[in-house]
Amino acid sequence: MSQDNNFSQGPVPQSARKGVLALTFVMLGLTFFSASMWTGGTLGTGLSYHDFFLAVLIGNLLLGIYTSFLGYIGAKTGLTTHLLARFSFGVKGSWLPSLLLGGTQVGWFGVGVAMFAIPVGKATGLDINLLIAVSGLLMTVTVFFGISALTVLSVIAVPAIACLGGYSVWLAVNGMGGLDALKAVVPAQPLDFNVALALVVGSFISAGTLTADFVRFGRNAKLAVLVAMVAFFLGNSLMFIFGAAGAAALGMADISDVMIAQGLLLPAIVVLGLNIWTTNDNALYASGLGFANITGMSSKTLSVINGIIGTVCALWLYNNFVGWLTFLSAAIPPVGGVIIADYLMNRRRYEHFATTRMMSVNWVAILAVALGIAAGHWLPGIVPVNAVLGGALSYLILNPILNRKTTAAMTHVEANSVE
């Protein structure tokens, strides 16, 4: 097995852990993404002013709680999402969530590259293929340097996006008559509140399932909860507000489009580039960790390979794969639910990653994911929340029953090895 400073095959040592501020910037860099603005635009034009804020705050609170669980587990153990999955899915069984998580992140990376290149190409007249090649290369080179590079990039990007985007929103709202005029807007096609909540939670629950990949570098597990809450409850909410304000004022959800319409071309390119760069690098970093769990290769090398694939296929992914990626992403929330459920039941096993005896494949975990997907699809309520709870509850109920002998045997062996 190849080792690298991404610690893709074992826990992050205390000497490599980082402070809460650095991780907060990294996680905000993940959640500052154009797709959340687009969803915010949909909500802003489909809900009243007060219902919009209620949906955004409740939805992102639920998202924050979910990611906080995963962040706590990641920081407590120092393990990636994929190594955590070994405890519940089995060593080879964890390849399934790793393939699902890693594959979707490569896909979204390619989509993100195209999301930058296409509007910039239209605004400047530059060749879109050239923009894709250059931006994809820059993003791929950055991720090669691991969590430290992600931190530096996010420290630059997060304040820039917040300040420039905030200024643009202020101009847009003032241009339509101020906050009172914004409050007075009546939705032409009202959106059901439960659908709105599902859109908010669903906007980032796929990437949120990978929270442990980043927060495992935290020195304190309790502070990891704070990091996840700030990123998803505050950071994601800000993107929704940007999108809603832009859509209400100028009919454009992406803040970079609003800025171009305002004549702020260079700031728009900066905001769009940094916005996508930070999220894409996090996606590429996480994809490398996923495929490292399957292959045992260096996650650095795999991230670079994934970046090249995503860049080459960017336009095709953008034009043909978004619907498929969205479908695949619906299968991801139950994976997080199963990981959380197993940790709650067997947290002492997680203290000894190197010596813990694990199953090859735990079919109960895979069944629980399938039941979680079914719960999300068929049960009334908030789809991604139902999927997480369906996966977690199915695992909590079925695993002790169907794996009683196996669990007892592993617990006995581990108890003897600790003694």
Swiss-Prot record:
The chain crosses the membrane at residues 20-39, 52-71, 101-120, 128-147, 153-172, 193-212, 222-242, 258-277, 301-320, 322-341, 359-378, 381-400. Residues 40-51, 121-127, 173-192, 243-257, 321, 379-380 are periplasmic. One of its GO terms (biological process) is cytosine metabolic process. InterPro entries: CodB, Pur-cyt_permease. GO terms for molecular function: cytosine transmembrane transporter activity. GO terms for cellular component: membrane; plasma membrane. The keyword Cell inner membrane applies. Required for cytosine transport into the cell. PANTHER family: CYTOSINE PERMEASE, CYTOSINE TRANSPORTER CODB. Belongs to the purine-cytosine permease (2.A.39) family. This is Cytosine permease. The gene is codB.
